[in-house]
Swiss-Prot record:
Gene3D superfamilies: 2.30.30.30, Nucleic acid-binding proteins (2.40.50.140), Ribosomal protein L2, domain 3 (4.10.950.10). GO terms for cellular component: large ribosomal subunit. HAMAP family: Ribosomal_uL2_B. GO terms for biological process: cytoplasmic translation. Residues 1-23, 36-58, 219-277 are annotated as: Disordered. Residues 8-20 have a biased composition (Polar residues). One of the primary rRNA binding proteins. Required for association of the 30S and 50S subunits to form the 70S ribosome, for tRNA binding and peptide bond formation. It has been suggested to have peptidyltransferase activity; this is somewhat controversial. Makes several contacts with the 16S rRNA in the 70S ribosome. Part of the 50S ribosomal subunit. Forms a bridge to the 30S subunit in the 70S ribosome. Residues 258-277 have a biased composition (Basic residues). The gene is rplB. GO terms for molecular function: rRNA binding; structural constituent of ribosome; transferase activity. Keywords: Ribonucleoprotein, Ribosomal protein, RNA-binding, rRNA-binding. This is Large ribosomal subunit protein uL2. PANTHER family: LARGE RIBOSOMAL SUBUNIT PROTEIN UL2M, RIBOSOMAL PROTEIN L2.
Length: 277
């Protein structure tokens, strides 16, 4: 995938970039793998706002993705590589020899016509899914399970990857994209390769309207609000926030404040914490 740049014909186009979608082979999704997706606008079942900055945006249909990769021993062939509006990564449609069709996350380098397989006996090649115990040390993987059979939960965004570092008893050491080294049960599955569409992070949205197309509403600074709306609000003119540290709209310390629980059950599985940003 390459980044497409635009001539500065307007203020919105100046600096704007987008994907050239060269890897996409069709714009017609598989209808049997679509599900309705209703917009919530950031509201819960009481109609109360629980997630800010959500609302509007283009209509979408959900693509049912096979994160479990549990179709063992049955080869499948890549039919198409498609755009998915619900995630940063592209997806690939797999036609299995028994007639079933499934979507998977499209790894970097996966081409139409490539044969893939899942299971302990699968080869170590891009797109194949195996238990971590069967993956050699040093292999780059993605779509990693945390519980056997639950489906991949880690390393699913565009361009991300993890690396198998070693094996200790019933656990496998994996270095995640954040730099965190974590112990994961060896029975958990992972897919070989790096997630594709790796230049997604380089895209410059360019204008506010493009964010609105994606369903993202504006973010207002607390310092320009009234004191009853935000701890940073009020004052004459451009006043400082008047606090020892920045606060969230609900009065909690933010911007660097540690929010992870002091006694988290998963601490025993973390060998090295993630790198500081």
């Amino acid at each position: 995938m390459a980044i497409k740049k635009y001539k500065p014909t307007s203020n919105g186009r100046r600096g704007m970039t987008s994907s050239d979608f060269a890897e996409i082979t069709t714009d017609q999704p598989e209808k049997s793998l679509l599900a309705p997706l209703h917009k919530k606008g950031g509201r819960n079942n009481q109609g109360k706002l629980t997630v800010r900055h959500q609302g509007g945006g283009h209509k979408r249909q959900y693509r049912i993705i096979d994160f479990k990769r549990d179709k063992d021993g049955i080869p499948g062939r890549v039919a198409t590589v498609e755009y998915d509006p619900n995630r940063s990564a592209n997806i690939a449609l797999i036609n299995y020899v028994d007639g079933e069709k499934r979507y998977i996350l499209a790894p970097k380098g996966l081409q139409v016509g490539t044969e893939i397989m899942s299971g302990p006996e699968a080869d170590i090649k891009v797109g194949n899914a195996l238990p971590l115990i069967n993956i050699p040390v040093g292999t780059v993987v993605h779509n990693i399970e945390l519980k056997p059979g639950k489906g991949g939960q880690l390393v699913r965004s565009a361009g991300t990857s993890a690396q198998v570092l070693g094996k200790e008893g019933k656990y496998v050491l994996v270095r995640l994209n954040s730099g965190e080294v974590r112990m994961i049960l060896s029975a958990c599955r992972a897919t070989i390769g790096q997630v594709g569409n790796e230049q997604h992070e380089l895209i410059n949205i360019g204008k506010a309207g493009r964010s609105r197309w994606k369903g993202v509403r504006p973010t207002v600074r607390g310092s320009v609000m009234n004191p009853n709306d935000h701890p940073h609000g009020g004052g004459e003119g451009r006043a400082p926030i008047g606090r020892k540290s920045p606060m969230s709209p609900w009065g909690k310390p933010t911007l660097g404040f540690k929010t992870r629980k002091k006694k988290n059950k998963s601490d025993k599985f973390i060998v090295r914490r993630r790198k500081n940003k």
